[in-house]
Amino acid sequence: MQITLMKGKIHRASVTEADLHYEGSISIDRTLLEAAGMVINERVEIYNVETGTRFATYVIEAPPMSGTMSLNGAAARLVMPGDKIIIVAYASFDEAEAKKFKPHVVRVDRDNRILAS
């Protein structure tokens, strides 16, 4: 049996941009991607803390240490710059792996700088 667990999370990041006319995705600072164990093109769930909206998209890389957290394409209609969001990636594990697995949780400040991971 496979069990789906949270693999990585970036907690309470601040949206820096919402670009309706860019190809759909979320651009995330590479430093945050690496700390959360996320990879380019990975499917992620986005939870908007301000509105309660939840949606899925995929990851593209933004420059490291830029603090970028940009929702692009149709997803740009679901956020506003300054909104707090939670970005979560999931993975499937067999039961034995699931019992041992520890997710990467990255907490950030209002400028999307790592506070703790």
UniProtKB/Swiss-Prot annotation:
Keywords: Autocatalytic cleavage, Cytoplasm, Decarboxylase, Lyase, Pantothenate biosynthesis, Pyruvate, Schiff base, Zymogen. GO terms for molecular function: aspartate 1-decarboxylase activity. Heterooctamer of four alpha and four beta subunits. It comes from Bradyrhizobium diazoefficiens (strain JCM 10833 / BCRC 13528 / IAM 13628 / NBRC 14792 / USDA 110). The gene is panD. It is an enzyme of class 4 (lyase). GO terms for biological process: alanine biosynthetic process; pantothenate biosynthetic process. This is Aspartate 1-decarboxylase. Substrate binds at residues 57, 73-75. Catalyzes the pyruvoyl-dependent decarboxylation of aspartate to produce beta-alanine. Its cofactor is pyruvate. Pathway: Cofactor biosynthesis; (R)-pantothenate biosynthesis; beta-alanine from L-aspartate: step 1/1. The modification Pyruvic acid (Ser) is found at residue 25. The keyword Lyase applies. Is synthesized initially as an inactive proenzyme, which is activated by self-cleavage at a specific serine bond to produce a beta-subunit with a hydroxyl group at its C-terminus and an alpha-subunit with a pyruvoyl group at its N-terminus. Binds 1 pyruvoyl group covalently per subunit. GO terms for cellular component: cytosol. It catalyses: L-aspartate + H(+) = beta-alanine + CO2.
